[in-house]
Amino acid sequence: MAKKSLIYREKKRQKLEKKYHLIRRSSKKEISNIPSLSEKWKIHGKLQSPPRNSAPTRLHRRCFSTGRPRANYRDFGLSGHILREMVHACLLPGATRSSW
């Protein structure tokens, strides 16, 4: 189980990303439309003004049950070992074990 503080921090990052999403998108559009380099630098400074944690690259996908940030399956929202346990216990309908 992940620490509660890490899960809370990730939720805070998600809120910040939603809040500053439009500002980042509009700044990126402005940069691509302006040909002069000096104007691009000014807009680039505006792009750096939002907090670091509002950048979408800082977000992690976390396991729904444990909060684990690694080895997540997007389809289920679970980490690998929890997914395996749930499939073995027949808790995920439609998921089957494979053996070869």
Curated annotation (Swiss-Prot):
Q: Which residues form a coiled coil?
A: none
**Compartment annotation:** Plastid, Chloroplast
Determine if Transmembrane helix is one of this entry's keywords: no
Give the UniProt keywords, A-Z: Chloroplast, Plastid, Ribonucleoprotein, Ribosomal protein, RNA-binding, rRNA-binding
Query: Which GO annotations describe the biological process of this protein?
Result: translation
Note one Pfam family from the annotation: Ribosomal_S14
What GO MF annotations does this protein's record show? Answer: rRNA binding; structural constituent of ribosome
One GO CC term of this entry?
Answer: small ribosomal subunit
Cross-referenced SUPFAM superfamilies, in alphabetical order?
Glucocorticoid receptor-like (DNA-binding domain)
> Which family would the database say this protein is a member of?
Belongs to the universal ribosomal protein uS14 family.
The subunit structure is: Part of the 30S ribosomal subunit.
What the protein does comes down to:
Binds 16S rRNA, required for the assembly of 30S particles.
What name does this protein carry? Small ribosomal subunit protein uS14c
The gene designation is rps14
